[in-house]
Regions:
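Catalytic adenosine-cofactor/nucleotide-binding cores of aminoacyl-tRNA synthetases and other
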Residues: 1-178
Length: 178
């Protein structure tokens, strides 16, 4: 699911006709699919292994983040009440919360403007507990996390920041490919 017809056509045209037995990596198909869906896939944040982060200092409580860097999609709105969710692997170190602020290892706001080259991470304010289903060989891996609030209908293909493309399902997300 999620592979677009134009990606399949491009894949088969690139592969061509041959009598030789060849192995083709799925990454080739996924590359064609990315070209087909990238420009129309809104961004969303899904925080795996989510941990809460209290922000200390002057930080905007209401704001917006672009839904897609190259299109006129409406921005994603957020409200920060108690803090934000970040991935556990990102906690405990100075980082830049994407399009929000620079923080130290303890969540103290150091700058609203980007001040240095620290890692930029995604985050969710509020959000809803959700599951991301990933096909891994013959297994289905279920990753629990916090999904950014959104209004996308079931079946919408979205780009999960730092993860890959997924389809919005009634009860969570289904990974298409990274």
């Amino acid at each position: 699911r999620g592979i677009q017809p134009e990606a399949l056509r491009a894949f088969w045209v690139e592969l061509g006709l041959t009598q030789k037995d060849i192995a083709v990596p799925l990454s080739t198909l996924y590359s064609h699919n990315t070209k087909a869906i990238e420009s129309k896939s809104p961004r969303l944040a899904f925080i795996r292994n989510a941990v809460p982060l209290a922000l200390n200092g002057d930080v905007p409580k209401i704001g917006s983040i672009v839904s897609h860097p190259d299109t006129a999609m409406p921005p994603r709105e957020y409200t920060i009440d108690q803090g934000v969710w970040i991935e556990q692997e990102d906690s405990g170190k100075p980082v830049r919360l994407k399009e929000l602020c620079d923080i130290d290892a303890n969540g103290n706001v150091e700058s609203i403007d980007r001040s240095d080259k620290r890692a930029v991470i995604h985050w969710v304010a509020g959000g809803i507990p959700s599951k991301l289903v990933i096909a891994s060989g013959q297994e289905l891996v279920i990753v629990e996390g916090i999904l950014e609030n959104h209004n996308h209908p079931v079946g919408t293909i979205v780009q999960l920041e730092r993860i890959g493309y997924a389809i919005v399902e009634e009860d969570g997300l289904l990974m298409v490919h990274d």
